[in-house]
């Protein structure tokens, strides 16, 4: 295993470099018959496309996806699905100047030692945030597969930038409002404060970190495995693959570590539709590495951009 493949039954292989000809992914294990087209991937790619505002990278890329295999007559065939994006806006000249001077906070030094200076350093190569586009392509398919087969839905949104934070409300409100602003925060007023904080830091030649919250609903109880293949283990591996992620918590997380057991426990109850639920969700929907039927709640901490 070289670190470029994620998953077991459904595997995602990421390839390409930031300033190479293209970046792409291969998703293997998707069953036949799922309605799928390039537009399904493009909708998600457009949400992360660079250059959309003054607070994102100013690199201009169209990020138009091309599906090369695995789709026929608008449906998956069960063959590996390969999709690529061509790189077009890559000025590598600044990287020639710094190639022998490791930048603080970047992977320059450890990658130079590991690969003996042969790694593609342009735009940070395989360590670039641009490679998240390959995850978005694979994630778009996985997301549709989960909705289509199990009616599982996942949303994510920003709850903190620097010292400015947002307390999440209902699932539906967060789902509806999260793309109404540049920082992807469901509350428009707090979003403006977050954006202003980013702009102020940028004026000072600096950057800010943040926290993203993710909620998955519709999962049945019992998904996952104990010990080394717990849901927390598998999800953490995937999420730590995103550049700049430095912290993850499930449910009450680090706050729960300050509570008593009686305060952190989630008592069971029978809901109005006769389902077993819990009164609270401090476990974040996972107990013993298995889903318990409650929403899975994850928070991911991102360090400030290094340059």
Which residues are covered by each model-predicted region?
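Acidic-glycine-rich active-site phosphate/pyrophosphate-binding loop
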Residues: 1, 103-118, 208, 262-272
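Glycine-rich anion/phosphate-binding loop at the beta-strand->alpha-helix junction
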Residues: 15-21, 205-307
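Alpha-helical support elements that line or immediately flank enzyme active sites
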Residues: 21-33, 130-152, 156, 229-237, ...
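Glycine-rich, mobile lid/loop segments that gate access to catalytic sites or pores
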Residues: 114-227
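A structural-propensity feature for long, helix-poor, extended segments
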Residues: 51-70, 165-173, 177-189, 266-280, ...
